[in-house]
Regions:
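Bacterial Sec-dependent N-terminal signal peptides
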Residues: 16-37
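Tryptophan-paired
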Residues: 51-100
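Structural motif
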Residues: 41-50
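Sec-dependent bacterial lipoprotein signal peptides
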Residues: 1-20
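Solvent-exposed loop and beta-edge segments used for protein-protein assembly and interaction
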Residues: 32-34, 93-95, 108
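Extracellular beta-sheet/turn segments enriched in Thr/Pro/Gly and aliphatic residues
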Residues: 25-29, 109-139
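Solvent-exposed strand-loop boundary residues in beta-sheet-rich modules
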Residues: 46, 61-63, 107-109
Length: 139
């Protein structure tokens, strides 16, 4: 009975390995279980958080409009908006993509944009912010 159970478990393990063949292209990677998010702060001319409307994140490589996919994208810090999270990593290249982030101030109706470079990809454990503004300030 023990031999049958052992053979059955080995068979299941082999089938599981074959189903995960697509991830084997990435080599042996150890990833953490954290969930990474990246965002941007919109501020008024005094540096205080500014509420915005019409938040837009456009991948400049693909033209695709991106949205943070997690329910954690709602921020409790005024003016800070989560724009992407690990659920978006397959929409990004490993080299990093330029993302045009745009928002319109509710107070002044002024629209401002910034470019932020974020990487991801099939083999990435998490998204990673490479460069770009961390704050957009309205006049």
């Amino acid at each position: 009975m023990k031999k049958i159970t052992l053979v059955l478990l080995m068979g299941i393990a082999l089938v599981a390995c074959k189903k995960n063949k697509s991830t084997s292209d990435c080599g042996n990677k150890m990833c953490t279980e954290e969930f990474v998010m990246t965002g941007i702060k919109f501020a008024d001319k005094n540096g205080a958080g500014a509420e915005i409307k019409d938040l837009s994140v456009i991948n400049q490589r693909t033209g695709e409009k991106l949205y943070a996919k997690s329910s954690a994208s709602i921020s409790t810090v005024k003016g800070y908006y989560v724009v992407l999270d690990d659920a978006n990593k397959l929409q990004l290249s490993e080299q990093g993509d330029d993302l045009k982030i745009t928002g319109t101030s509710i107070t002044t109706n002024q629209t401002k944009s910034a470019i932020v470079k974020v990487s991801g990809g099939k083999c990435a454990c998490h998204i990673s912010r490479i460069s770009g503004a961390e704050q957009i300030t309205f006049d």
